[in-house]
Design a protein with these regions (language model features):
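Secreted/extracellular ectodomain signature
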Residues: 20-137
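Helix-enriched interaction subdomains in cytosolic or periplasmic regions
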Residues: 1-2, 17
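Sec-dependent signal peptide recognition
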Residues: 2-10
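Hydrophobic h-region of N-terminal signal peptides that target proteins for export
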Residues: 10-18
Length: 137
């Protein structure tokens, strides 16, 4: 966790120097069911989107992170809905994960979209030059 926080801090400090000149594209990989991980993901997305206002961010959730985007279970529902309204932030959930958890799109927080495969979504973003951050404990 300390390593993640230190990495984010370095990125934020660097971003202050280059925010206006060099927009970034970052994909966040979230698989944990731990609500502390969900909360730290939201903090990181908020901080980085403020530091890089002209940049793009996508949070990809799969496996154990299903509850992060469920209306009735998420500890960060209000934040997810608020951030998803921004043009430069996307929250996506894996359809395979939804199927395994027997969840349909009506149960998702407003603004969350689904993709066929979370891992492939991350791979595609990386192929397009997006930076990668793994959110974990």
């Amino acid at each position: 966790m300390k390593r993640i926080i230190n990495t984010v801090l370095v990125l934020l400090l660097t971003s202050m120097c280059f925010a206006q000149e060099n927009p970034v594209k970052i994909v966040f990989d979230v698989t944990s069911q731990n609500t502390k991980v969900h909360e730290s993901t939201i903090r990181h997305v908020k901080a980085m989107s403020n530091a890089y206002p002209d940049s793009k961010f996508e949070v990809v959730m799969y496996s154990g992170a299903m509850d992060m985007v469920l209306k009735d279970k998420s500890a960060v529902a209000e934040d997810v809905e608020m951030l998803a309204k921004k043009d430069n932030i996307d929250f996506v959930i894996c359809q395979g994960t939804m199927k395994r958890h027997e969840v349909d799109s009506t149960q998702l927080i407003k603004g969350v979209r689904s993709v066929p495969d979370g891992i492939l979504e991350i791979i595609e973003k990386q192929k397009e030059g997006w930076g990668y951050i793994k959110e974990s404990q």
